[in-house]
A protein has these predicted regions:
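Conserved beta-strand-loop-beta-strand element in the redox core of flavoprotein oxidoreductases
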Residues: 161-180
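Conserved N-terminal/central alpha/beta ligand/cofactor-binding core
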Residues: 52-53, 58-162, 204, 212-214, ...
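Aromatic pocket-lining residues of Rossmann-like dinucleotide-binding sites
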Residues: 47
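N-terminal Rossmann-fold NAD(P) dinucleotide-binding loop
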Residues: 40
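N-terminal secretory signal peptides that target proteins for export/translocation
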Residues: 1-5
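Beta1/beta-strand and adjacent pyrophosphate-binding region of the FAD-binding site
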Residues: 27-37
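Flavin (FAD/FMN)-binding glycine-rich loop and adjacent Rossmann-like elements that form
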Residues: 137, 171, 179-185, 189-560
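Bacterial N-terminal signal peptides
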Residues: 9-23
Length: 561
């Protein structure tokens, strides 16, 4: 009896000792998706629908990226180009709001139905383009549950030594936790492109000079003032100095003293990030704007001068989403965009990125608190802001604050084909379309500087129309051959800074995620490199799945007699 007990104890001890090791053994899948963004979830769903084993692994605790992180006022562009699973997402949103129970804080017929270039609710097409964050997150969670896709959350790629390759193919990726994932195909669906970079793939950070790809809107854009996110939008020039007009008094916070650069030149700077914060004016659901830790009212001295110079558009991008809430975006010369404080984010360590995120959160929460409480704010603006607050029923585990910052741009792959403004403007045809984009060529401000005249000004904000919807090349999803022959990159796509300004919209990321997964399965089944997937067969499959690869050319205008 004692011998049996000793044997049992010994076996249990051995089992306990081996459990952690088993936990860290490689998990093998056909397709490994790194990143739980909208593109990542859609890519995983497509791979599973095509009969493959797939896992979504990444740092995310919440699925859906920006689509579930506050960006509910969708950058739709031309909705006719949104097909496949991307369109299905917006159909599922429509189905949710088609139920009376979804309208918690207002009746459906009281909602204004405003969208970006399209009605929010498109009953004829059974789609809805505007939504609350928690609704989007539920749709993404439903996708993985329905398709029985495992999701491994809060797993961070070991960027230094976690990518193992056999020649030009990725064999496995290992997380900082020690967990390893082997796969036949890999998809980097992160906003940062961490897997892409760690795999030895070429990429770029910042703006290329216009001369690199023969563009107009890339590079430094000193003197170009689009939209109203610049200091020309107020009635008089604003001094950047602590004592107006006196350089010796020092420069106000959040203004760079560096030269902005020469028009058209490249740099390594990144367009501004912000949180797409959601607010509500329903008293029962409203959390007053909190005073953040580290709050410093001096950081907003420039904002006081903006109001003194006649700014009256504080609420210009409090865009309405259902149930008396907003998707709130940057608007104006000094707003929620934290200009100049994200330059090192794309390449930064995880710890440094956390510092950047904390600084952005402090700045943006402080901006709201300052407007709602500082006595120097115009009384009408302050009274209006005090009617708003963070919603109790959104981002419940984060005090009503979004869990995902808007990484508008980080790394961009330099891949098999580089998309530029020339394809978007129809100056050059796009080969092998795998989806379409249509949104305006859009970059937010990159820097805030002092002009030669001694005034403060912003630089980098661009809003230029495309020549209608445009195709996106398959080659922009894959690296150069020989660098990573089983990797797809549907978010940090191969494109110039300014082309990415239009491509970078959430509906397009979902389109490209589905196309990437389709091609990944085809490459795997044929035993070929991702760069060698036959275009005609891929096109056939994408069309069968409802993807839109081109629109009919407009009829030529009749000649005047």
């Amino acid at each position: 009896m004692k011998t049996s007990r000793r044997l049992l104890a010994s076996l249990l001890s051995c089992a306990a000792a081996t459990l952690p090791v088993l936990h860290l053994h490689a998990a093998d899948f056909d397709v490994v998706v790194y990143g739980g963004t909208s593109a990542g979830v859609i890519a995983a769903v497509q791979a599973k629908k095509m009969g493959k084993t797939v896992v979504v692994v990444g740092p995310d605790k919440h699925l859906g990226g920006l689509s579930a992180g506050g960006l509910g006022f969708t950058d739709t562009g031309n909705k006719a180009v949104i097909g496949g699973l991307s369109r299905d997402f917006y159909h599922r949103v429509w189905a949710h709001y088609d139920q009376p129970i979804a309208w918690t804080w207002q009746k459906k017929d009281q909602y204004g139905n405003k969208g970006q270039g399209t009605p929010a609710i498109d009953g004829a097409q059974r789609t809805m383009w505007i939504f609350e964050p928690h609704v989007a997150e539920k749709v993404f969670e439903d996708y993985v549950k329905e398709n029985q896709i495992p999701v491994h959350r809060d797993e961070w790629l070991d960027r230094a030594k976690g990518v193992k390759k056999n020649g030009a193919r990725i064999a496995s990726i290992t997380m900082l936790s020690g967990k390893t994932y082997t796969g036949k195909m890999f998809i980097d669906a992160t906003y940062e492109g961490d897997l892409m970079a760690a795999s030895g793939v070429d990429y770029h950070v910042g703006r290329e000079a216009n001369s690199v790809y023969g563009e107009q809107w890339n590079g430094v854009q000193v003197g170009v003032l689009h939209h109203r996110h610049h200091f020309g939008a107020v009635t008089s020039p604003i001094s950047p100095y602590v004592i107006p007009g006196d350089p010796k008094s020092g420069v106000l916070p959040r203004i760079s003293t560096n030269h902005p650069g020469v028009y058209g030149a490249g740099d390594t700077k990144v367009q501004a990030y912000c949180y797409r914060y959601c607010v509500t004016d329903v008293p029962e659901n409203r959390i007053p704007f909190p005073r953040p830790d580290g709050y410093d009212p001096k950081q907003y001295e420039l904002l006081v001068r903006v109001y003194d110079a006649g700014w009256k558009e504080t609420f210009g991008k409090f865009d309405p989403i259902p149930n008396h809430k907003t998707d709130s975006n940057n608007h104006g010369p000094f707003s929620s965009d934290n200009i100049g404080f994200n330059y090192d984010y794309p390449e930064a360590s995880y710890e440094r990125r956390r510092e950047i995120l904390r600084e952005h959160e402090t700045y943006q929460k402080g901006w709201l608190y300052f407007i709602a409480n500082d006595p120097r704010i115009p009384k009408d603006v302050q009274a209006a802001m005090q009617k708003w607050g963070l919603p109790k029923d959104e981002f419940k585990d984060n005090g009503g604050w979004p869990h995902q910052i808007y990484v508008r741009e980080a790394r961009r792959m330099i891949g098999h084909y580089v998309m530029t403004e020339n394809e978007l403007l129809k100056k050059r045809p796009t080969p092998e379309s795998v989806g379409m984009g249509s949104y305006t060529i859009d970059s937010h401000n990159v820097q805030r500087y002092i002009t030669p005249e001694g005034h403060v000004q912003n630089e980098g904000d661009i809003g230029a129309p495309t020549m209608g919807p445009y195709e996106i090349a398959y080659g922009s999803l894959v690296p150069k051959k020989g660098q990573a022959d089983n990797l797809f990159v549907p978010v940090c796509v191969s494109s110039s800074h300014i082309a990415f300004g239009s491509i970078r919209m959430e509906p397009v990321f979902m389109i490209l995620g589905q196309s990437a997964a389709t091609a990944a399965v085809m490459a795997m089944d044929s035993g070929i490199a991702v760069q060698d997937v036959p275009s005609a067969k891929l096109r056939e499959h994408l069309l069968k799945d409802g993807q839109i690869l081109e629109l009919p050319a407009p009829a030529p205008k009749a000649k005047k007699k």
